[in-house]
């Protein structure tokens, strides 16, 4: 039987909060985050293995154009960070990736940031990208006979260019997940205010009023 708090003013009693209302965040946030992270990382690793098996190592075949002159498939090994930045620091970026993944999990589930569905989705994408690239940075794909500098390099295969003079560095699905998550975080910071403490936002739009919340100027029903 549900208990209710008696309002001294004589207005309708306020129902006691249920267990789900008192929870820090919905339990399905675990499934959302870890599902995205694992699926994203697995898709990235599968795609890299399949493309490199099909197209070979960098420099062995010409570009396979999907949209001639603009978008295609070309294998490459990136020994830097995202889009080739920081070349030669693969192990440093691997250490940063491990720290970032641990910090994300702590932020979501220990500091309760998982109250936000949007934020959970964004960080799930980022973690999936971290997993995909971390596997390569730790050298799990590398085999004896390959160049030593590739041992902490990341396999890339997506080619996009606006023209022959303007070519974007090759990237992969993990990079795409990282960028998608980063864009979502920017959108979150500009358009989605954080939910009140202890309240999960679910799929609520910013500023949306809860169904039982009285509007300004209305009075509660008398008992």
UniProtKB/Swiss-Prot annotation:
Membrane topology: Multi-pass membrane protein
InterPro entries: Peptidase_A8
Segments traversing the membrane: 32-52, 65-85, 91-111, 116-136, 173-193
GO biological process: proteolysis
Sample GO molecular function, one term: aspartic-type endopeptidase activity
Subcellular location: Cell inner membrane
Catalysed reaction, written as an equation: Release of signal peptides from bacterial membrane prolipoproteins. Hydrolyzes -Xaa-Yaa-Zaa-|-(S,diacylglyceryl)Cys-, in which Xaa is hydrophobic (preferably Leu), and Yaa (Ala or Ser) and Zaa (Gly or Ala) have small, neutral side chains
GO cellular component: plasma membrane
Domain of life of the organism encoding this protein: Bacteria
Family per similarity comment: Belongs to the peptidase A8 family.
Keywords: Aspartyl protease, Cell inner membrane, Cell membrane, Hydrolase, Membrane, Protease, Transmembrane, Transmembrane helix
Heme as UniProt keyword: no
Name used for this protein in its record: Lipoprotein signal peptidase
Keyword Protease: yes
EC number, UniProt record: 3.4.23.36
Pathway info: Protein modification; lipoprotein biosynthesis (signal peptide cleavage)
Protein purpose: This protein specifically catalyzes the removal of signal peptides from prolipoproteins.
A Pfam family of this chain: Peptidase_A8
PANTHER family: LIPOPROTEIN SIGNAL PEPTIDASE
Positions of region (Disordered): 1-20, 196-223
HAMAP family: LspA (MF_00161)
Species assigned in the record: Rhodopirellula baltica (strain DSM 10527 / NCIMB 13988 / SH1)
Active site: 156, 175
């Amino acid at each position: 039987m549900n208990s209710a708090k008696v309002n001294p003013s004589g207005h309708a009693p306020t129902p006691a909060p249920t267990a789900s209302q008192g929870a820090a965040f919905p339990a399905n946030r675990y499934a959302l985050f870890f599902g995205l992270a694992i699926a994203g990382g697995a898709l990235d690793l599968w795609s890299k293995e399949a493309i490199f098996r099909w197209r070979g190592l960098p420099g062995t075949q010409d570009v396979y154009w999907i949209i001639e002159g603009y978008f295609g498939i070309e294998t490459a090994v990136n020994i830097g960070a995202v889009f080739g930045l920081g070349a030669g620091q693969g192990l440093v970026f691997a250490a940063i990736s491990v720290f970032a993944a641990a910090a994300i999990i702590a932020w979501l589930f220990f500091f309760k940031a998982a109250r936000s569905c949007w934020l959970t989705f964004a960080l799930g994408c980022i973690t999936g990208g971290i997993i995909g690239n971390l596997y390569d940075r730790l050298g799990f794909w590398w085999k004896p006979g390959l160049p030593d500098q590739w041992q902490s390099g990341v396999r890339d295969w997506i080619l996009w260019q606006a023209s022959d003079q303007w070519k974007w560095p090759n990237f992969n699905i993990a990079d795409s997940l990282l960028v998608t998550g980063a864009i979502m975080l920017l959108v979150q910071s500009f358009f989605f205010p954080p939910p009140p403490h202890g309240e999960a936002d679910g799929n609520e739009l910013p500023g949306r009023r809860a169904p039982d919340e009285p509007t300004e100027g209305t009075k509660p029903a008398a008992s």
